[in-house]
Amino acid sequence: MGGLRKPKKKYLAGKPKKIWNKQLLLEELQLMGEYGLRNKRELWLARARLKWITRRARSLLSMTAEERAPLEMPFKEKLYKAGFIEDPNVPLDRILSLDVRAILERRLQTIVYRMGLAKSIYHARQLIVHGHIAIEGRRVTSPGFLVPRELEDKITLVQ
């Protein structure tokens, strides 16, 4: 993280090198509309998280089988509990094929919309920010909250 006086931005790993690439701009705009993101920083944060996951999977693949054995299963279980993969027994190659949509699908805003609690993805964001969504009875006001698999069923609408 660096020194306390010079904190580093969390999204720098996900920020593109060439910001004005037309293809990338169109792709980002499409993702922002589909997932109701407020700005590109939210997308870059998701990309940074994905980059961390793929980097870790790549480092595990480069290890020998004996070195990899004690580290691989906890990593896969962590991804499964977070909801990024469907089965904790998937091969590491499958983890490398994850894209940013896997991360964006776990955001509270997206899950509230997919559950049918909101009419649109933007309505879901407004419900969350205004404090009308609770997880296990606790109000969550951050639309970017990554919902773990175990809490997905405990999302409720609070009036």
Swiss-Prot record:
Origin superkingdom: Archaea
UniProt GO MF annotations: rRNA binding; structural constituent of ribosome
Keywords associated with the record: Ribonucleoprotein, Ribosomal protein, RNA-binding, rRNA-binding
Organism expressing this protein natively: Pyrobaculum arsenaticum (strain DSM 13514 / JCM 11321 / PZ6)
CDD domains xref list: S4 (cd00165)
Annotated HAMAP family: Ribosomal_uS4_A
Family affiliation: Belongs to the universal ribosomal protein uS4 family.
Function: One of the primary rRNA binding proteins, it binds directly to 16S rRNA where it nucleates assembly of the body of the 30S subunit.
InterPro entries assigned to the protein according to its UniProt record, in alphabetical order: Ribosomal_uS4 (IPR022801), Ribosomal_uS4_arc (IPR022802), Ribosomal_uS4_CS (IPR018079), Ribosomal_uS4_euk/arc (IPR005710), Ribosomal_uS4_N (IPR001912), S4_RNA-bd (IPR002942), S4_RNA-bd_sf (IPR036986)
The protein's name: Small ribosomal subunit protein uS4
PROSITE patterns hit by this protein: RIBOSOMAL_S4, S4
Gene Ontology CC: small ribosomal subunit
Known partners and oligomeric status: Part of the 30S ribosomal subunit. Contacts protein S5. The interaction surface between S4 and S5 is involved in control of translational fidelity.
Record Pfam families: S4
One Gene Ontology biological process: ribosomal small subunit biogenesis
Coiled-coil ranges from the UniProt annotation: none
